[in-house]
Amino acid sequence: MSTSTVPPDGGEKVVVVGGNDWHEVVAAARAGAAAQAGERIVVNMGPQHPSTHGVLRLILEIEGEIITEARCGIGYLHTGIEKNLEYRNWTQGVTFVTRMDYLSPFFNETAYCLGVEKLLGITDDIPERASVIRVMLMELNRISSHLVALATGGMELGAMSAMFYGFREREEILRVFESITGLRMNHAYIRPGGLAADLPDDAITQVRRLVEILPKRLKDLEDLLNENYIWKARTVGVGYLDLTGCMALGITGPILRSTGLPHDLRKAQPYCGYENYEFDVITDDRCDSYGRYIIRVKEMHESVKIVEQCLARLKPGPVMISDKKLAWPADLKLGPDGLGNSPEHIAKIMGRSMEGLIHHFKLVTEGIRVPPGQVYVAVESPRGELGVHMVSDGGTRPYRVHYRDPSFTNLQAVAATCEGGMVADAIAAVASIDPVMGGVDR
């Protein structure tokens, strides 16, 4: 026999079980679930939604305006890049990985190339000029990525001016990228052993102009939002995630640093000579969306400082390793053919050196051979730790390449930052996570 009672304070119904009455217990449980079903609603936000930063699907269970459960649905942008890498040589792989996190392509390329170079044992042989240019491009890319995060986040919360300002400054940076690499995005400019080509003649002038105008432009963006009453009302205390939650979920990047922990791989595990640059690791202790916004704004100023140091350190020299078994036998200057082959090089391999022609053909078609082994390398992308686990079986193609994309890992924070808050606050919380679905789904 079972009896049900309701406490005097009007709390949940209590079912007391006396034995041999399982069907009554089940009936009471079903009745309770049915009563709650009328109050709770499951809502799909996305995958086609302007505020989900791509094809992200949020399954929200709501009770009134309060989110009681939040889950992510991913996979809508799966492209099979990691599998495709197993069917391309080590150099061709760069053209695939640059398309993953499409807002920070230089970080994808650098992480991949650092892994290949570590397997080859040539990490310390990379020309100084190539490393400095890598750092310069990554920091400009960090600024452009953060500008998109602030612009889209502002648009979603109604700050349209922030969107116009953010995309205006990003456009200036993309013009420089196009001048240097030939493409605004998906550059495939960083290659194992160095770079695809040296900087064009006017690149330094363009970058200098950029670092002159960016501080004032970024200050304009700060003036719009830092003390904006509506902006603070929508972000302060919203999307709260403390240090314990970040460590439990493996969260990195601005979200982790917004808890006060100064973890940045550029300082903790330097690569590309970052130990030679002076910059601060920006932290905040608010643990909320506003703190992450402040971190991204201040990080852009630090990136400008690093780019200025890169310009000062940039000395003439090669941009590709000198080992002819690894580097294409060309000077890699952009020639009239548009493919990076100078007339002098073409004349040499076509007319005066049959061995050079054969070697060039094998390097381009078959690719370099990488010793067997496995490595893990990581860089500090705009979203956190971007890691690459790379396995070689001694052939001309990777046996396996796996990316630890920070967007994928950080999406685990959706439930922790959204549950218990308002539906409208989920927009601000996801915007502060700044996921890029190209990196999540790969």
From Swiss-Prot:
Disulfide bond entries: none
Entry's Gene Ontology molecular function annotations: NAD binding; NADH:ubiquinone reductase (non-electrogenic) activity; quinone binding
Alphabetical list of NCBIfam families matching this protein: NuoD (TIGR01962), PRK06075.1 (NF004739)
Function: NDH-1 shuttles electrons from NADH, via FMN and iron-sulfur (Fe-S) centers, to quinones in the respiratory chain. The immediate electron acceptor for the enzyme in this species is believed to be a menaquinone. Couples the redox reaction to proton translocation (for every two electrons transferred, four hydrogen ions are translocated across the cytoplasmic membrane), and thus conserves the redox energy in a proton gradient.
A GO term from the CC aspect: plasma membrane
Mode of membrane association: Peripheral membrane protein
Similarity remark: Belongs to the complex I 49 kDa subunit family.
Keyword Ribonucleoprotein set for record: no
Assembly description: NDH-1 is composed of 14 different subunits. Subunits NuoB, C, D, E, F, and G constitute the peripheral sector of the complex.
Keyword Membrane found: yes
Keyword line: Cell membrane, Membrane, NAD, Quinone, Translocase, Transport
Major place of residence: membrane
HAMAP family on file: NDH1_NuoD
Protein name listed in UniProt: NADH-quinone oxidoreductase subunit D
Top-level taxon in the UniProt lineage: Bacteria
